[in-house]
Curated annotation (Swiss-Prot):
Gene3D superfamilies: 3.10.450.50, Helical scaffold and wing domains of SecA (1.10.3060.10), P-loop containing nucleotide triphosphate hydrolases (3.40.50.300), SecA, preprotein cross-linking domain (3.90.1440.10). Residues 963-992 are annotated as: Disordered. PROSITE patterns: SECA (PS01312), SECA_MOTOR_DEAD (PS51196). It is an enzyme of class 7 (translocase). This is Protein translocase subunit SecA. ATP binds at residues 99, 117-121, 633. Keywords: ATP-binding, Cell inner membrane, Cell membrane, Cytoplasm, Membrane, Metal-binding, Nucleotide-binding, Protein transport, Translocase, Translocation, Transport, Zinc. It is found in: Cell inner membrane; Cytoplasm. SUPFAM superfamilies: Helical scaffold and wing domains of SecA (SSF81886), P-loop containing nucleoside triphosphate hydrolases (SSF52540), Pre-protein crosslinking domain of SecA (SSF81767). Its main location: membrane. GO terms for cellular component: cell envelope Sec protein transport complex; cytosol; plasma membrane. Zn(2+) binds at residues 1002, 1004, 1013-1014.
Length: 1020
């Protein structure tokens, strides 16, 4: 019934395309009219459109004319030489109808799925121009700095021709230049640069002038699935060094390496013993087995099952599992042990190992044998206490019940217990991360070693991520494992996920070649529809059926054979691999067989542009990781299309169908011919971990001769099912991340709003007074609950609390009056503290010499000091809160064992923590406002002028007496999408008036450096 209606009325997708096609026709009509306009008349359209918008017209009404203007400009640029990335390129592009169609979809907040070579970059110019007419911020998000710079210089020419300004936001742009770039009508940049600038504006800027961004109106995300799907689980983090790091990786690494070696040796022995029995059985034949041998055979298969749990990548195990009968026998043991009645026996069997590795779940578990070995065989490194956490509550009770201790001794003992508990937890955490580094993180798959540093490999793109670090101490654990220098521990200063960052935009859209498989996720999380845009020319690519082999060895032999045959015809070949390790293995095979080739992986990423430029040439063979699978445009050398075009081979099916489609899309661009084929083995991770167990029975029936591919419809379906299973798992993880970050996001918005209010308000004094009043009110609520309850009305306690917070004197019976209500008490306290604050401000302001005020120095430095104190306290306590939230996130995962929902627990406790932060923040800000002092320099104005110093106004600084050190500024140096490091500037003495460099000669004429002379400021 529904199919019949669909044929009559078309799908929603078809109806939308038809509606947009009518708009394309309007665009073309206007384009015809505009061809008669002069250049000046065409350029004047921008001002005309802006005026019409101001007069009430809507963007949708302007769309046909605006898009037609862009199309007309592109036509007039034909033949123009444009300088792009150091080279001159000739403009030869005018948008096709399908590109106009994609531009309409993006303006309407959809994701345009456009095939390789269909001109996504030019398509984006039309909606960028239209939305930039509003004067609001318009951003084009790219996947790397090179594309941001290139697109700004290349297609940005159209926007500049029409009078708009453009800017390229790359990692190399200095902080002081960024505000100017953000003032541009259209800004090109990477997601990480936009995200880090947002974090810096809201967590590091000390004034409104320091903030660079101007809002979030419209964004188009290039390769939107890569950024919003693949990168969604990777938060942007600005981090800095931990002042008191407790890391023990150096101390523990030898012991962990020994434990892992013992596990490996144990599994190798088990596998070797099993192989001997299996070979003996095979030599005798199935008809000559006695009962004892049959028992030995079953025991051998049990050992192999155990080896799979201890070292899943064991070479002996992998070789034996090439035989479908042995694979089936091992699977039988797996089914046996998963039966409910055999759970206890399974536990006893696994206890033979030191540790159990769950390769599919990417987890591990230490057994009792492993714990005992850690204590016994690690040369005194291991300790029983490494796996026993203290119960601080019980320990505190014991201290309180110890009558031999006085109050001071009890407090000291509790501090000692707290310190010991923190040390134990840190040691246990370091131990867990070292084990994870050894058991679950693989060199040349998850990371490479470059310049004696650990460099992460992006699992989706295959590109190296220099500067990015694994979080939670894992990166340091890998550094310890590989014997490179262990970098300092860091803590989070500010963080946000890309999901929540991009959801701040008023309008969001995107473009990619592969989005339909994730359409539901785009709709559910980002409210974005996916629209497939037809191709300009028919796609001539031929996708061959997959070739499936039993073993990797057979698969590689088949690839070698196919490469030789295709190479003889001089067709270019691109071979896509999943990891650096596989690309290097294939390279060795090709070298041994005399095939000249080029390798592109994370170790050769500097040569990417050069290698891709050569990949479309006659007889070229290119082995590449996923780096060549997205965003690269391989152009064919003249004559290659006649040979059949580029031949793309995949060495495995990836866990995501989008990655496979991206690899296929490297060939047959813009109507060129091309072929693609995937080669798969049952040793590939996808099939080994996620394929249906029924495959084993199929293999036993259809096992082909050595070297022959397996052909069975069920296998192809099973591969697709496995991919869907992985995609669903990853989607669940991304959604899980978002649910937790949504809690953080609400808190982040509250803190950043409070911080921006402090920065934006002209006069900080009313804000300071409001904070003092709220603190006095919070204290009153604590000490004045009820007159009828014993201890419920405590005026003396309130007075002592106020004296502890503020340097203000309250008479002994100031609040101890029968007629006073709590509101009156609050007001009395607040009035007295506010009066003291005003006196403090007036006193500090009076310290500024009159001649400095005449030179332009602020007459109210105390206001600046208070503002800076508020900002610094907010930042400091927010950073501490983030650390507590990280710990909470780790802790709540264990609540699932007690049948409690971790997310619900997280929300509940996160709210309590934030409520505590809000109260403590106001209290600390109120306290700190009385603990600063303005210190003016002793030099005379004449001395300063004689020294020829440059005068800087509005630089009033202060000494924070509470911390007994000058304030510090911190600057972020972001290099990556995941982590950025904070550098702390050395603290400088705080002065009012013109600044003198610390290493400059002192203007007093002593001949000494300023830092050794008059710059010495004592804090009284």
């Amino acid at each position: 019934m529904f199919g019949f209606l669909k044929k009559i009325f078309g799908s929603a997708h078809d109806r939308l395309l038809n509606r947009y096609r009518k708009q394309v026709e309007e665009v073309n009509k206007w384009d015809q009219k505009f061809q008669s306009l002069s250049d000046e008349q065409l350029k004047a359209k921008t001002a005309e459109f802006r005026l019409r918008l101001k007069n009430g017209e809507m963007l949708d009404q302007l769309l046909p004319e605006a898009y037609a203007v862009v199309k007309a400009v592109c036509r007039r640029l034909n033949g123009t030489e444009i300088h792009v990335s150091g080279y001159n390129q000739r403009w030869d592009m005018v948008p096709y109808d399908v590109q106009v169609l994609g531009g309409i979809a993006m303006h309407n907040g959809a994701i345009a799925e456009m095939h390789t070579g269909e001109g996504k970059t030019l398509t984006a110019v039309m909606p960028l121009y239209l939305n930039a007419l509003t004067g609001k911020p318009v951003h084009l998000i790219t996947v790397n700095d090179y594309l941001a710079q290139r697109d700004c210089e290349w297609v940005g020419t159209v926007l500049r021709w029409l009078g708009l300004t453009t800017g390229a936001l790359t990692n190399s742009v200095a902080i002081e230049k960024r505000k100017e770039i953000y003032e541009s009508d259209v800004v090109y940049g990477t997601a990480s640069e936009f995200g880090f600038d947002y974090l810096r504006d809201n967590s590091m800027a000390m004034s409104k002038e320091d903030q660079v961004q101007r809002g979030y109106y419209f964004a188009i995300i290039d390769e939107v699935d890569s950024i919003l799907i693949d990168e969604a689980r990777t938060p942007l983090i600005i981090s800095g060094p931990v002042p008191d790091s407790r890391q023990m990786y150096d101390e523990l690494k030898e012991g962990v390496a020994e434990l892992v070696r013992r596990q490996r040796d144990l599994c190798n022995r088990l596998a070797s013993d099993a192989r001997k029995v299996v070979e003996e059985v095979e030599a005798l034949g199935s008809g000559k087995k006695d009962k004892k041998l049959e028992e030995s055979e079953q025991e051998a298969y049990r050992k192999l099952w155990l080896v799979g749990k201890g070292t899943p990548q064991n070479k002996i195990l992998k070789r034996l599992k090439e035989n479908p009968d042995i694979r089936a026998a091992i699977d039988k043991w797996d089914l046996y042990y998963h039966a409910e009645q055999n759970k206890e026996e399974r536990t006893q069997t696994l206890a033979e190992l030191y540790m159990i590795i769950d390769e599919k779940g990417n987890e591990y578990e230490l057994t009792d044998k492993g714990i005992n070995a850690w204590q016994t065989y690690t040369n005194g490194i291991g300790s029983p206490e490494d796996f026993i956490m203290m119960d601080i509550g019980d320990e505190y009770i014991k201290v309180d019940e110890d009558l031999s201790l006085d109050a001071e001794s009890k407090m000291a003992r509790k501090m000692q217990i707290k310190e010991e508990d923190a040390k134990r937890k840190e040691r246990a955490h370091n131990l867990r991360q070292l084990l994870r580094a050894h058991l679950l993180m693989e060199k040349d798959v998850d990371y490479i070693i470059h310049d004696n540093k650990i460099v992460i490999i992006d699992e989706n793109t295959g590109r190296p991520q220099p500067g990015r670090r694994f979080s939670d101490g894992l990166h340091q654990a890998i550094e310890a494992k590989e014997g490179v220098e262990i970098q300092k521990e860091t803590q989070t200063y500010a963080t946000i996920t890309l999901q929540n960052f991009f959801r701040m935009y008023e309008k969001l859209s995107g473009m990619t070649g592969t989005a339909t498989t994730e359409a539901n996720e785009f709709k559910e999380i980002y409210k974005l529809d996916v629209l497939e845009i037809p191709t300009h020319r028919a796609n001539r690519r031929v996708d061959f059926n997959d070739e499936i082999y039993m073993t990797e060895r057979e698969k590689y032999n088949a690839i070698l054979k196919e490469v030789r045959e295709v190479h003889e015809k001089e067709r270019p070949i691109l071979i896509g691999t999943e990891s650096v390790e596989v690309s290097e293995k294939l390279s060795r095979i090709f070298k041994q067989n005399g095939l000249e080739h080029t390798v592109l992986n994370a170790k050769q990423n500097e040569r990417e542009a050069e290698i891709i430029a050569e990949a479309g040439k006659r007889a070229a063979i290119t082995i590449a990781t996923n780096m060549a699978g997205r965003g690269t445009d391989i152009k064919l050398e003249p004559g290659v299309a006649d040979l059949g075009g580029l031949y793309v081979m995949g060495t495995t099916r990836h866990q995501s169908r989008r990655t496979d489609r991206q690899l296929r899309g490297r060939c047959a661009r813009q109507g060129d011919p091309g072929n693609s084929k995937f080669y798969i083995s049952f040793e590939d991770a996808l099939l080994r971990l996620f394929a249906s167990p029924r495959i084993t029975s199929v293999l036993q029936k259809f096992r082909p001769p050595e070297g022959e591919p397996i052909s069975a419809g069920m296998l192809n379906k099973s591969i697709e099912t496995a991919q869907k299973r992985v995609e669903q798992r990853n989607y669940t993880m991304r959604k899980h991340t978002l649910e937790y970050d949504d809690v953080m996001n609400k808190q982040r918005q509250e803190i950043y709003a409070f911080r921006n209010e402090i920065l934006g308000v002209g006069n900080i004094e009313p804000v300071a007074i409001e904070i003092i009043e709220s603190v006095c009110s919070m204290g009153a609520d604590q000490f004045f609950k009820s007159r009828s309850e014993e201890g419920g009305w405590n005026p003396e306690g309130y007075r002592q609390w106020l004296l502890h917070l503020f340097p203000v004197t309250f008479d002994e019976y100031f609040f101890d009056k029968e007629h006073l209500e709590i509101e009156e008490i609050e007001q009395m306290a607040a009035d007295k503290v506010v009066e003291a604050l005003k006196e403090k401000i007036a006193s500090e302001n009076a310290k500024v010499p009159g001649h400095l005020i005449a030179m332009g120095e602020s007459p109210f430095p105390a206001h600046t000091a208070i503002r800076n104190l508020m900002i610094r306290k907010t930042d400091q306590m927010w950073q501490e809160h983030l650390l507590r939230m990280d710990h909470l996130r780790s802790d709540v995962t264990l609540r699932a064992v007690g049948q409690r929902d971790p997310l619900t627990e997280f929300k509940h406790e996160a709210f309590a923590l934030f409520d505590e932060l809000s109260r403590n923040l106001r209290t600390e800000v109120a306290r700190s406002m009385f603990r600063f002092e303005i210190i003016a320099p002793q030099q005379t104005l004449e001395q300063l002028l004689q020294s020829g110093l440059r005068l800087e106004t509005n630089r009033s600084l202060f000494v924070d007496l509470q911390n007994e050190q000058p304030s510090q500024e911190m600057a972020a140096d972001e290099e990556t999408q995941e982590e950025s490091k904070i550098e702390e500037n050395k603290p400088e003495p705080i002065v009012v008036g013109p600044r003198v460099g610390r290493n400059d000669l002192c203007p007093c004429g002593s001949g000494k450096k300023f830092k050794k002379c008059c710059n010495k400021v004592e804090i009284v």
